[in-house]
């Protein structure tokens, strides 16, 4: 379907009936609309499939496909199911007729090659509707998407009877009204087994549900948003505008690249219909600009990536290059080394006290450069060892040493755990952290290297903590499900973590700390196996699809880095969150407690995670013995 160019808003016009489809399409295009939502059959033409003589009525059932080119049908028309069709009617005759009519309309839309077909959800029980649709999807090989039109609030929940300025009571019954239409949608997509061809077209009314309910909707696969003309207000110049609350919702929908559909009759007689589009364009141009992190992550939204395993694999040059561009991480490392040098070397010793600094996992040298800058800033002397196991990156380090660093830096090619250091270090600096903190085996690496750290030596970072938060996301659940590999267990893809820029999701509760590691590790017996039990309260009806993982780290004293949402280091993009999926979505009721058990396991050769939900219901333990995913030591 036609999408907006660049940042332009993609918009459509919803019409109840079309007499001349080509003329109407042309008129809509002149107004600035990108596509047309229209009935494929005349809305009042109730076909008869069982009784004569109506059953055998001669003549075409609807207009010919020759009225438009195939390209126009494929890109500019969204079909609509006839309103009179009631596939879940308790009256047998109505149900059977509706089934046949729906089948006819679905087949004809597939024949036309429509990009999308609109089906309204008007009640909680849509079992037969879901059966008909999923059968249609499985029988054919068509590319049509199915947009389920669902109001954010059911019509009888709209608060027309509220007295102006009267305080609104938030009793349990009042809140249940906000839940109703989401339950329609959730039941429907569950019956259709989260099929990727079924998406959501929300209808935005004059009244909106509460903020946390809207946030839940934003975790659903929304493709379109219907804006009735009746919800627009009129400003002093006669132009249509929306309330501030509606504007905030529109801004959030822009981020999801939702297409907007204007429905209803023209309520601003002095202005053309295009004034509604002009207003949406105005909102788009005045929406909050993306920050540095969002700019960097553009195109990676909800794209699953396997976590890096730099201990087992040698990284490519381009991978190093991406991480080296981070404007925040290395300035924070520089600040940490700077403060550490000032603490360790008094002013009167700055000419004689040479600190031994070892960069463990030097890569292509960004930490070496940051440390040298810190020493210059602090006016302290350092001797640097740059230890790197990747022989390809060592070539780059030797180039740096030859051209820039000179004898101040010694390049060591080898594994830090096996290196026999000629002297002990005052400071060891490393960047071995993954999206979950310890998932790139920083604990094992630094524990193996701390024997060449002086007794009073400092590790940068000094500690790091992983965090977990329960999330709901149909999009991510389907993305994980699609990762099935031919020769593996059919559910193995649910037993491994993924690095992902979380976008189309809803976080159900605040992150809680999971595992913490300190360096240097002073324990008598070093054991990096871990277990934790985390509990979260859920404040609304929803579905659990997995857990988002984050971390924060203390580099040195008050110098920190974080990817936790509430404390994210501004402008830092070196790490996306990590996702731990679960095999089966778990429905959650308002007030439920999510309890998740998490293990970090190590058998001397590999490290892996195991996880299980134990409340409100028990899931299977995911990834036992590391059968689906391990991290090689």
UniProtKB/Swiss-Prot annotation:
PROSITE patterns on file: SAM_MT_PRMT (PS51678)
GO terms for MF: E-box binding; histone arginine N-methyltransferase activity; histone H2AR3 methyltransferase activity; histone H4R3 methyltransferase activity; protein-arginine omega-N symmetric methyltransferase activity; transcription corepressor activity
Any Pfam family matching the protein: PRMT5_C
CC terms in the record's Gene Ontology section: cytosol; Golgi apparatus; methylosome; nucleus
Superkingdom of origin organism: Eukaryota
Xref: SUPFAM superfamilies: S-adenosyl-L-methionine-dependent methyltransferases (SSF53335)
Binding positions (a protein): 323, 431, 440
Active site per UniProt: 431 (proton donor/acceptor), 440 (proton donor/acceptor)
EC annotation from Swiss-Prot or TrEMBL: 2.1.1.320
Family annotation (InterPro entries): Arg_MeTrfase, Arg_MeTrfase_PRMT5, PRMT5, PRMT5_C, PRMT5_TIM, SAM-dependent_MTases_sf
Compartments where located: Cytoplasm; Nucleus; Cytoplasm, Cytosol
Protein's GO biological process: cell division; circadian regulation of gene expression; Golgi ribbon formation; methylation; mitotic DNA replication checkpoint signaling; positive regulation of proteasomal protein catabolic process; regulation of DNA-templated transcription; regulation of mitotic nuclear division
Subunit composition and interactions: Heterotetramer; dimer of heterodimer with wdr77. Interacts with wee2-a; this interaction is disrupted upon activation of the DNA replication checkpoint.
Protein name: Protein arginine N-methyltransferase 5
Protein species of origin: Xenopus laevis
């Amino acid at each position: 379907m036609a999408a907006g160019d660049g940042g332009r808003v993609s918009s459509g016009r919803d019409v109840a009936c079309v007499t001349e489809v080509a003329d109407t399409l042309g008129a809509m295009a002149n107004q600035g609309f990108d596509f047309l939502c229209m009935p494929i059959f005349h809305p009042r033409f109730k076909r008869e499939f069982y009784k004569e003589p109506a059953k055998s009525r001669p003549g075409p059932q609807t207009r010919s496909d020759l009225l438009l080119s195939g390209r126009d049908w494929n890109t500019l028309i969204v079909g609509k199911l006839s309103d009179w069709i009631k596939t879940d009617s308790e009256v047998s005759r109505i149900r059977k007729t509706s089934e046949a009519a729906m089948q006819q309309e679905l087949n004809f839309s597939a024949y036309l090659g429509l990009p999308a077909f609109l089906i309204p959800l008007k009640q909680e029980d849509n079992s037969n509707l879901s059966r008909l649709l999923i059968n249609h999807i499985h029988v054919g090989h068509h590319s049509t998407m199915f947009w389920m039109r669902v109001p954010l609030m059911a019509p009888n929940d709209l608060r027309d009877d509220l007295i102006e300025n009267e305080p609104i009571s938030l009793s349990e019954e009042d809140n249940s009204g906000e839940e109703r239409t989401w339950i329609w949608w959730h039941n429907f997509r569950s019956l259709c087994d989260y099929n990727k061809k079924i998406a959501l077209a929300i209808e935005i009314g004059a009244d909106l549900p509460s903020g946390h309910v809207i946030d839940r909707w934003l975790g659903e696969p929304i493709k379109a948003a219907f804006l009735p003309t009746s919800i627009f207000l009129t400003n002093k110049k006669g132009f249509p505008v929306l309330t501030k609350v509606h504007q905030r919702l529109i801004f959030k929908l822009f981020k999801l690249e939702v297409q907007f559909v204007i429905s209803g009759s023209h309520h601003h007689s002095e202005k053309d219909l295009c004034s509604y589009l002009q207003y949406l364009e105005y909102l788009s141009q005045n929406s909050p600009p993306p920050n540095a992190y969002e700019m960097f992550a553009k195109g990676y939204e909800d794209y699953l990536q396997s976590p890096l395993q730099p201990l087992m694999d040698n990284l490519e040059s381009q991978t190093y290059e991406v991480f080296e561009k981070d404007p925040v991480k290395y300035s924070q490392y520089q600040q940490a080394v700077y403060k550490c040098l000032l603490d360790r070397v008094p002013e009167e010793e700055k000419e004689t006290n040479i600190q031994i600094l070892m960069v463990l996992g030097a890569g292509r040298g960004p930490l070496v450069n940051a440390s040298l800058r810190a020493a210059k800033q602090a006016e302290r002397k350092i001797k640097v060892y740059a230890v790197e196991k990747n022989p390809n990156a060592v070539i780059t380090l030797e180039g740096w040493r030859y051209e820039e660093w000179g004898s101040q830096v010694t390049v060591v090619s080898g594994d830090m755990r096996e290196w026999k250091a000629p002297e002990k270090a005052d400071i060891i600096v490393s960047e071995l952290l993954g999206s979950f903190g310890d998932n790139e085996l920083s604990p094992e690496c630094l524990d193996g290297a701390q024997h060449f750290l002086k007794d009073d030596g400092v590790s940068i970072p000094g500690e790091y903590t992983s965090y977990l938060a329960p999330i709901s996301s149909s999009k991510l659940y389907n993305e994980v499900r699609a990762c099935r590999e031919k020769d593996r267990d059919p559910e193995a893809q649910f037993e491994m973590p993924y690095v992902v820029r979380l976008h189309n999701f809803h976080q159900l509760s605040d992150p809680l700390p999971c595992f913490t590691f300190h360096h240097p590790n002073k324990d008598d017996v070093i054991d990096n196996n871990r277990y934790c039990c985390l509990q979260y309260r859920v404040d609304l009806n929803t579905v659990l699809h997995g857990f988002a993982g984050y971390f924060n780290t203390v580099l040195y004293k008050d110098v920190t880095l974080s990817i936790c949402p509430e404390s994210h280091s501004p402008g830092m993009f070196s790490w996306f969150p990590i996702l731990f999926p679960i095999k089966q979505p778990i429905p959650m009721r308002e007030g439920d407690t999510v309890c998740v058990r998490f293990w970090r396991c190590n058998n001397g050769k590999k490290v892996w995670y195991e996880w299980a939900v134990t409340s409100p219901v028990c899931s299977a333990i995911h990834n036992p013995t590391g059968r689906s995913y391990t991290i090689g030591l």
